[in-house]
């Protein structure tokens, strides 16, 4: 489903094409899905689950909240680069081309990620420095940078956005100096290849 959506767009993806790509019978498809919308919704849910898994796995009691956020962003970008059909489906097709219900899992995942990012507020010198909507705002900005890269055909280069996204996510909570420090750590991780 995801590959077909990337190649043809959701509107042009057919059950027949999905069946052919998956190598299954129409009966097998019908046992699992009530049509292309249902299949698309399942694909979105799968991607959201994988994003949640890699983001959660990045959190460690051995790391600070900010380091965990950095590692979660890194893991997300690496997942999307490694699974190139995921990024356009979740960030483009699922958001703009599929039925409105398909956007709900993405929105729910953003709320979970925003609550993770908002935990940085506890480490801010001025706890009221960032507005209440800062976490959602920085994730929206990160999503826009990712969508631009996806639309430009640079999915495999998504991990290169790590320093910029880390800076943008950290600055409202930790201030410029700390955000620059974590962006520098992100750049070092990229340069080390890990």
Can you annotate each of these PLM segments?
Residues 15, 43-53:
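Short, basic, alpha-helical segments at the C-terminal edge of helix-turn-helix-like DNA-binding modules
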Residues 68, 80-100, 114-121, 147:
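Amphipathic alpha-helical segments used for helix-helix packing
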């Amino acid at each position: 489903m995801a590959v077909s959506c990337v190649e043809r767009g959701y509107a042009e993806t057919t059950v027949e094409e999905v069946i052919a790509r998956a190598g299954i019978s129409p009966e097998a498809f019908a046992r699992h899905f009530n049509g292309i919308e249902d299949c698309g919704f399942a694909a979105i849910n799968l991607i959201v689950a994988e994003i949640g898994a890699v983001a959660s796995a990045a959190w460690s009691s051995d790391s600070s909240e900010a380091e965990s956020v950095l590692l979660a962003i890194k893991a997300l970008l690496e997942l999307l680069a490694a699974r190139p059909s995921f990024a356009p489906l979740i960030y483009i097709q699922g958001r703009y081309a599929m039925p409105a219900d398909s956007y709900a899992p993405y929105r729910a995942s953003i709320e979970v990620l925003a609550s993770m990012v908002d935990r940085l507020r506890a480490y801010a010198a001025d706890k009221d420095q960032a507005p209440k909507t800062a976490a959602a705002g920085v994730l929206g900005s990160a999503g826009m940078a990712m969508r631009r890269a996806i639309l430009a055909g640079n999915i495999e280069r998504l991990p290169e956005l790590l320093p910029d996204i880390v800076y943008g996510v950290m600055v409202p909570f930790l201030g410029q100096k700390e955000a620059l420090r974590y962006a520098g750590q992100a750049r070092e991780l990229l340069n080390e290849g890990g």
